Swiss-Prot record:
It comes from the Bacteria. GO terms for molecular function: rRNA binding; structural constituent of ribosome; zinc ion binding. Belongs to the universal ribosomal protein uS14 family. Zinc-binding uS14 subfamily. PANTHER family: 30S RIBOSOMAL PROTEIN S14 (PTHR19836), SMALL RIBOSOMAL SUBUNIT PROTEIN US14M (PTHR19836:SF19). It comes from Mycoplasmopsis synoviae (strain 53) (Mycoplasma synoviae). This is Small ribosomal subunit protein uS14. Binds 16S rRNA, required for the assembly of 30S particles and may also be responsible for determining the conformation of the 16S rRNA at the A site. Keywords: Metal-binding, Ribonucleoprotein, Ribosomal protein, RNA-binding, rRNA-binding, Zinc. Its cofactor is Zn(2+). Pfam families: Ribosomal_S14 (PF00253). Binds 1 zinc ion per subunit.
Length: 61
């Protein structure tokens, strides 16, 4: 329940711009969020493995 409240709080426009912070749009995780995709590293990895993010593939060299 607390996580849902924090997600809703993060969606609101803050009074001061410095108070804004990124959260994962899928799970609400506040840390390790990739700004370009607006999702956390864990969700990014899962979606990349499923092939749901175009242009992303596992690196190998």
């Amino acid at each position: 329940m607390a996580r849902k409240a924090l997600i809703e709080k993060a969606k609101k426009h803050p009074k001061f711009s410095s108070r804004a912070y990124t959260r994962c749009e899928l799970c609400g995780r506040p840390h390790s969020v990739l700004r370009k995709y607006k999702i956390c590293r864990i969700c990014f990895r899962n979606l990349a493995h499923e092939g749901k993010i175009p242009g992303v593939k596992k690196a190998s060299w």
